[in-house]
């Protein structure tokens, strides 16, 4: 314990968040108690409350971390290529890589987030998570508008509904491929990669102008 007291507060918080993430992955958020997190992190429950007010605060930090990572993946995908199809392909690849490296975070990104900041009953992390989420939506919006201006994507797309459907379809395909990989291989004779490529192609064809869809 003497060693811990000399460590910065941020180190303790990171240790606890990391342990909580592992516990949430194993048991689920609702089934994980502060006692479970304390035990996994190697802290007493009393010490845990020195660094976090409650479990919701820990969940809020994890949600923020997940959104930051997603932002990085999307940003990286969009700056690597100029053509609409290539940028789309890299978005898909980035999302697959994100899910494979951070499966728990991938699921968290799809969860409900707080959007009511009129009252004072919200965590600072919740506002920042919302802000980053809006920045991601803006990037996807610009991607769609750019594709429409180039004549690659349909010009009748209603942008905001298109963005949410875009996320829903891509994330659903990726999560399904992760959960049902063995079934897909056995019943369809497709590898996970081939199944994903087919699904991503269907989504792209749904928003692309037919003459220019690949």
Kindly give the residue locations of the regions a language model identified.
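Basic, helix-initiating cap at the start of DNA-binding domains
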Residues: 1-27, 31-40, 57-60
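Short hydrophobic/aromatic patch on the recognition helix
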Residues: 20, 41-52
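Base-recognition residues in the alpha-helical recognition helix of bacterial helix-turn-helix
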Residues: 25, 49-53, 65
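Short coil/turn motifs that cap or connect alpha-helices
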Residues: 30, 44, 53-55, 83, ...
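Short, basic, alpha-helical segments at the C-terminal edge of helix-turn-helix-like DNA-binding modules
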Residues: 64-71
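Hydrophobic alpha-helical connector segments
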Residues: 65, 76-104, 159-166
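C-terminal peripheral helix-coil segments that are non-catalytic and often amphipathic
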Residues: 97, 138, 142-150, 164, ...
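Short secondary-structure transition hinges
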Residues: 100-139, 161
């Amino acid at each position: 314990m003497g060693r811990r007291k000399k460590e910065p507060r941020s180190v303790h918080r990171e240790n606890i968040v990391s342990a909580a993430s592992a516990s949430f992955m194993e048991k689920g958020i609702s089934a994980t108690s502060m006692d479970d997190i304390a035990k996994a992190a190697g802290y007493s429950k009393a010490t845990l409350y020195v660094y976090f007010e409650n479990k919701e605060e820990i969940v809020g930090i994890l949600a923020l971390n997940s959104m930051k990572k997603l932002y990085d993946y999307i940003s990286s995908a969009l700056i690597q290529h100029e053509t609409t199809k290539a940028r789309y392909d890299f978005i898909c690849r980035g999302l697959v890589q994100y899910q494979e490296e951070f499966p728990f975070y991938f699921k968290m990104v799809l969860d409900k987030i707080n959007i009511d900041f009129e009252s004072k009953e919200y965590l600072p992390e919740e506002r920042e998570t919302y802000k980053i989420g809006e920045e991601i939506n803006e990037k996807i919006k610009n991607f769609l508008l750019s594709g429409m201006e180039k004549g690659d994507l349909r010009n009748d797309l209603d942008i905001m509904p298109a963005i949410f459907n875009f996320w829903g379809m891509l994330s659903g395909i990726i999560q399904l491929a992760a959960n049902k990989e063995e079934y897909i291989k056995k019943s369809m004779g497709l590898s996970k990669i081939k199944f994903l490529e087919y699904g991503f192609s269907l989504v792209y064809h749904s928003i692309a102008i037919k003459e220019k869809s690949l």
